[in-house]
Amino acid sequence: MVAFLAYGLLIFRLGFYWDELPITWIRYQLGSEALTRYFSTNRPVWGMLHQLTTRILPQVPAYWQIFAFLWRWLGAVVVYAIVARLWKGKPQSALGVALLFLVYPGFNQNSAAYLYSHFYIVLFFFLCSLLCMLQAMDSPKRYWAWTVAGILFSALNLWMMEYFYVLELVRVGVILVALRDESLTLRERIMRTLTLWLPYLGVFILSVLFRLFVFNNQVYGMGLTSQLKSAPIETLRKLAQSILFTLRLVLKDAWLQMLVLPDVADFRSVMNIYYLVIAAVILIATAGFLFMRRDELQTTRKNVIDASWIVGLGLLAVFLSGWPFWLIGFTPSLAWPANRFTLSFAFGVSLIFGGLIGLIPWEKLRIVLLVTLVSLAAGRQYLSARDYQQDWEIQKDLFWQMTWRAPGLKPNTLVLLNEGALDYYADNSLSSALNWIYAPDNHTDQIEYVLFYPTTRLKNALPELSTGIPIYYDYLAG
């Protein structure tokens, strides 16, 4: 119910956004081979996942919204199972971490359902690999069955995309947390950890070698390496600044934006629904905590130790989450579209917040804090979905106006459009919609129409504002 209130209220009024338009146009208009070419230069294995899902679902936004909703929810379910295993006897605390993960406010692009459903699937694979490993630790008779399943899920995560790539190394932290109560000497603990980690470490090393020597045609190269050679001190200083900025962003700023109210024309009607969402989440989350089996009473020292382990694991996860972006010189942001990078931090951040709240000795205060954070974050996600819904309506109105006022747009036409009216579309996004509308029977790799933002393309893909000049623009598929 919390997932539905955060993401499902506008599910049938949302559409395709940003990279979704060109990817779906390439797949459904130009065919599966064109989609293979599109992913050939970056994430080819992830492209296979797109091939599979697009064979199942048509180019209907509502289907993809439901699809993404289910994967987002399933990810939170797996997080609950992981934390419940690591934090034994604390089901309420595990629920709190799962809910924080579900509605993490740093990432607000859930409405781009086609695109991010495939992110959620890969994240689900990573989380399932951790859960399978924990199951293997608890089931000696089925150790290898669970381990093989965990290795498979881990490989799918590592081979498909880079967002959760370095986060794979948090596995050693998960093992240490799971073993914390076992009576082992230091040597036995190290050997036990290495034994459990070694199969997954082998898969990680193989994937690194694959990216280095087999498929090294990455769109974004690791510029940090060359920068370290040319200016090591300055590069390390900037890297440290980027890391600190990112940590503040995902741990503090992401949550503070929950308190920012929207500046919209129909403010009252929007806020009425917003307050209803928050109130409903408060009731549902409170009921969930109260009806769930209460956390076991433990000594203060045991509570502090267990919660501290969870916080430590979260800190490790957050630190590892940023390296796929820091290595290529990207810094996460809360602005669109760069807040997509915060998705990889959601697991670690939810562990940190859940662990810190778990340090509080008073159960009622813990529940109040968790419910407050979850309800405000769910309300923020609803407001984000509404922004996307409004942008979809403006985009549809734009092309309705075009087909009404310029029904006979000739092939090989360049359309120039001022920026500012649309928040969640780039000009190459709109180019695909333009071709879908004006050239519905064109299934070749020759694109008949292109839409440019002059401020973005002038002096680049668009040499000058003149008629009859050749324009070369590549969609990778056409």
Regions found by a protein language model. Give the residues of each.
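Polytopic membrane enzymes that build or remodel cell-surface glycoconjugates and lipids
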Residues: 1-448, 455-456, 461-478
